[in-house]
């Protein structure tokens, strides 16, 4: 009956998914599972449940739901116009990444670039990284990451070299306080937009310097950062955090809105093995094969059968927050041993406490393999 009605109305669809109309949770569960952005129904209870689950929901106007205050449309054309407008209202994104550091950055960059229907990617800025054991200086790391970004974009047939900017050549904790292309671009983009999301998957140096140079951006940006460890852990000697602790302090001491995805015991749950990657991505594209190759031997940790693909967590959080559980806390202080000290200050920040590994990887494989 539904198919016949859709065909008679000339309504095009990719998939037809039927749910139990008597189960008010059924549509919300399916929307979350399939990462559906917008839902429409004429049932107030179904719409209300979808709204409770963070799904953008429209009520089709009927005589029996006219007393509800849920946003509604009266005609299918109105819904079409709403969806068209919604799709054009993409979130402005800056990705701050140390792309050549490990294999997870390449996965995250690919994942982001495969979701341009959701995001307006304003810039990709190169975060600093270095390794004494590999004799890689920050300056060399900048070049390696910059070239890696361009290589991945070329595989995806994207010419966005004008959106890639080199960043800091040292860390604030080493006395570095210079502006650079990345810092200047972060400020420029933040000031021109009403809202910009900065996705940090490396040391937070560029972002901290931008806040320090132009405090006006504080109320115009939101930071989503992978760094540190879970609340209550003995220390934060995690790579992104320990590279530039002074930069973390600058961000914490500002009033900027920030969500932190901790590594130990939270994002570490994204561990996966090489066989699962091969089963889902092998031979889907030249880029997918490269990602598998980098996963197997990232040139730093040596050959490994399984790893955590850390950085995809930040992209996934922006795609669907329903895959995560969070906790809002008073912004902690950072002790000398890098551990967090609880406070009662009024500044609140958000910590991710749990994630749905399976849903994240299901979406990553689907998008990356397209």
Where are these regions (language model features)?
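Short His-Asn-centered micro-motif
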Residues: 1, 19-20, 40-43, 98, ...
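Substrate-recognition "cap/lid" segment bordering the active-site pocket of phosphatases
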Residues: 2-38
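Anion (oxyanion) recognition and catalysis
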Residues: 7, 51, 252
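Short hydrophobic/aromatic-enriched beta-strand-loop microsegments
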Residues: 13-17, 56-62, 120-122, 218-225
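Asp-based, Mg2+/Mn2+-dependent phosphohydrolase catalytic module
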Residues: 24-33, 43-89
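Conformational coupling and interaction surfaces
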Residues: 89-92, 104-121, 239-250, 254-370
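Active-site histidine-anchored catalytic micro-motif
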Residues: 90-134, 139-140, 171-274, 356
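Metal-dependent C-N hydrolase catalytic cores
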Residues: 135-192, 346-357, 365-369
């Amino acid at each position: 009956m539904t198919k016949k009605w859709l065909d008679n109305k000339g309504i095009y669809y990719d998939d037809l998914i039927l749910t139990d109309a008597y189960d008010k949770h059924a549509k919300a569960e399916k929307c979350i599972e399939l990462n559906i952005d917008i839902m429409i129904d004429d049932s107030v209870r179904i719409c209300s449940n979808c709204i409770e689950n963070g799904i953008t929901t429209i009520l089709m106007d009927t005589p029996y739901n006219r007393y509800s205050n849920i946003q509604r449309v009266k005609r299918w054309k109105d819904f079409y116009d709403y969806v068209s407008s919604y799709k054009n209202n993409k979130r402005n994104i800056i990705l701050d990444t140390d792309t050549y550091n490990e294999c997870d950055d390449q996965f995250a960059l690919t994942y982001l670039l495969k979701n341009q229907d959701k995001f307006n990617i304003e810039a990709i800025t190169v975060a600093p990284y270095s390794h004494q054991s590999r004799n890689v200086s920050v300056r060399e790391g900048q070049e390696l990451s910059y070239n890696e970004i361009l290589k991945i974009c070329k595989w995806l047939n994207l010419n966005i070299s004008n959106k890639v900017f080199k960043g800091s050549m040292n860390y604030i904790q080493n006395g570095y306080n210079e502006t650079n292309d990345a810092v200047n671009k972060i400020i420029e983009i933040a000031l021109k937009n009403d809202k910009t999301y900065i996705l940090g998957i490396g040391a937070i140096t560029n972002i901290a310097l931008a806040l320090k140079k132009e405090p006006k951006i504080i109320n115009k940006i939101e930071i989503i950062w992978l760094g540190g460890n879970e609340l209550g852990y003995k220390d934060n000697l995690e790579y992104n955090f320990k590279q530039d602790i002074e930069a973390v302090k600058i961000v914490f001491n500002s009033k900027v809105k920030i969500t932190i995805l901790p590594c130990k015991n939270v994002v570490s749950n994204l561990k996966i093995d090489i066989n699962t990657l091969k089963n889902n991505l092998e031979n889907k594209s030249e880029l997918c094969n490269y990602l598998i190759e980098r996963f197997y031997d990232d040139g730093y940790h040596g050959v490994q059968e399984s790893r955590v693909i850390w950085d995809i967590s930040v992209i996934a959080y922006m795609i669907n927050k329903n895959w995560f559980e969070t906790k809002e806390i008073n912004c902690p202080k950072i002790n000398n041993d890098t551990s967090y000290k609880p406070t009662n200050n009024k500044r609140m920040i958000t910590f991710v406490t749990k994630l749905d590994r399976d849903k994240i990887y299901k979406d990553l494989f689907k998008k990356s393999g397209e």
